[in-house]
Amino acid sequence: MYGIDIELSDYRIGSETISSGDDGYYEGCACDKDASTNAYSYDKCRVVRGTWRPSELVLYVGDEHVACRDVASGMHHGNLPGKVYFIEAEAGRAATAEGGVYTTVVEALSLVQEEEGTGMYLINAPEKAVVRFFKIEKSAAEEPQTVDPSVVESATGSGVDTQEEQEIDQEAPAIEEVETEEQEVILEEGTLIDLEQPVAQVPVVAEAELPGVEAAEAIVPSLEENKLQEVVVAPEAQQLESAPEVSAPAQPESTVLGVAEGDLKSEVSVEANADVAQKEVISGQQEQEIAEALEGTEAPVEVKEETEVLLKEDTLIDLEQPVAQVPVVAEAELPGVEAAEAIVPSLEENKLQEVVVAPEAQQLESAPEVSAPAQPESTVLGVTEGDLKSEVSVEADAGMQQEAGISDQETQATEEVEKVEVSVETKTEEPEVILEEGTLIDLEQPVAQVPVVAEAELPGVEAAEAIVPSLEENKLQEVVVAPEAQQLESAPEVSAPVQPESTVLGVTEGDLKSEVSVEADAGMQQEAGISDQETQATEEVEKVEVSVEADAGMQQELVDVPTALPLKDPDDEDVLSY
C-alpha cells in the first residue's frame, strides 16, 4: 500500500492510501492540512482518484463529500464538479519509484456540474506540483509524520522548496495529558475519617481513676459592654496509681456545671454518696441584693482545711474533703487543693479578654492499709447572668473542725456596705457514732476521735475564692484557674473516720443573691467573728446574710467578708441572731 501527498501552488491534498497494482490506479482521501497543527484536517477531505503512469499523473480532486469516478481511459473524468490536474513526471525518475515523483502541472481542468452533464473548463495550472508517495503497512492506517528530504524537491530539481515542504509535512507532537494524583487515604473497615481534622491521641486511663478535683469557675461578664473574647477550659485528670490495701471506701463526688447567658442559669452540684444527698439552693426569691456600685474591690474567700481521707482499695478520693487529724503510724500529707474561684467582672465597662480554666488532678499513689471511710463533700456552684442565680453548696460530715476564714489580706473593699446579719446557731451535741466496715454514715452526725498509733497530717485545702471586680471601670484581662491536686502518698493504717465539712457559697449578678452557709456537727463550739484585719469596707451593703451553723465542739472563725458579701460597718461587729 502506498500513500500520496500532493502539493499544488493553489491547493494541497493528501491521501491515506492508494491502491496497489501494475495499472497504477489509486483512489483515496485527499485532505487539507491544518496550518496550526501541520496535520491533516479530515473535515476538509475530498475524494481523490487518478491514474499513475510513467509519464504523467492524471489526478482528479472532487469537491468535499462528493464521490468521483474515472470515466475515461486517461484524460477524461466523471461528470461531477472538481478539478483535474495533468501532471508530468520528472524526466529520469520512475513513476513507480517509492518515495515520490517530481512533477510539473501541464494542464488543469475545472469540472462544473451542468444540466446535461459535467462541463470541463481549462483553468490556470499551478506553478508547481510536488507529489510524494510513501509505503504504508497494511496494518497501519496513518501517514508517516515525516518525509525523507531527499524525495522532496521542486519541479525544476533545484531543491529550493525542499526545506519548506519538509516543515509543512511535519506534524506537531502529540499533547501529553498529565493526570494529577490524589492523596490516597487508607481506612480500616468500618471507620470514618475526616481528612481535615487532626487526630488527637487519647490517653489510656487506669482502672482506678481519681475523680478530678475539678474546680468550678463561673465568670459573668458585663451585661452592657463587656465582651468575652475567649474561654478555655482544659481540666486534666491524671491517673490514680497503686492504692493497695485500703479497707474502707470513700465516696466520690459528682459535679454539674452549667452556664447560660441572657437568662443565664448555672448550677454546680456536687453530691456525696453516703445516704446523704444534700443540695442547698439559693433562689432568686431570697431577699438578698448587692449594691450595683462596688468599685475596685476584690475579696478572696479562702477556707483552709486540714483533711484526711481514708481509702479502700480501688476507691476514689475527693482531695477537697476536710478530715480531722487522727494519729496513725506514719505521717501522710495531702497537698493543698485550690477548690474554686468565682469572678464577676464589671456590669458596665469591664471587658473579659480571656478565661482559662485548667485544673489538673495529679496522681494519687500508695495509700495502703486504711481502715475507715471518710465521706467527701458535695459542692453546688451556680452563676447566672441577667436573672443570674448562683449556688455554691459545700456539705461535709460531723466530727470535723471547720474554720471558715474570709479575709482580704491583699484586697481592699472601698465602697458601700449595708445590712449585715450574722446568725449563729449552735446545735446540741448528738450521740457518738462508731463505724464498722461497710456501714453508712450520716454526714451531719459527729463521730468521736479514736486514737491510733501514729500521726497523719493533711495540709489545708484552699476551698474557694470569689473576686468581684469594679462594676464601672475595672477591666478583667485574664483569669486563670489552675488548681492542682497533687499526689497522696503513704497513709497507712488509719482506723477512725472523720467527716468532712459542708460549705455553701452563692454569688449572683443582676438580681445577684449570695449566701454563705457553713454547717457543722453538734458538740462543737462556734465563734463567728467579723473583723477587718487589713481591709477597709467603707460603704453600703444591701441585704447580705451570712449564716453559720456549726456543731458543738467545733470552732469556726469568719475573719472577713468578700466583696460579694460586704459589711455594714468595718467597726461594727454586731452579731444578729434570728
Swiss-Prot record:
It is a multi-pass membrane protein. Induction: Is induced within the initial hours of A.phagocytophilum infection and is strongly expressed during the bacterium's intracellular replication phase. Sequence repeats lie at residues 180-272, 304-425, 428-557. Polysumoylated during infection on at least two lysine residues, in the N- and C-terminal section. SUMO2/3 modification of AmpA throughout the infection cycle is likely critical for bacterial intracellular survival, while terminal SUMO1 conjugation of AmpA may promote a late-stage infection cycle event. Only a small portion of the available AmpA pool is actually SUMOylated at any given time. GO terms for cellular component: extracellular region; host cell cytoplasmic vesicle membrane; host cell cytosol; membrane. It is found in: Secreted; Host membrane; Host cytoplasm, Host cytosol. Residues 180-557 are annotated as: 3 X approximate tandem repeats. Its main location: secreted. Keywords: Host cytoplasm, Host membrane, Membrane, Repeat, Secreted, Transmembrane, Transmembrane helix, Ubl conjugation. Residues 144-169, 516-578 are annotated as: Disordered. Pharmacologically inhibiting sumoylation in infected cells significantly reduces the bacterial load. Secreted effector that hijacks host cell SUMOylation during A.phagocytophilum infection and is important for the pathogen's intracellular survival. This is SUMOylated effector protein AmpA.
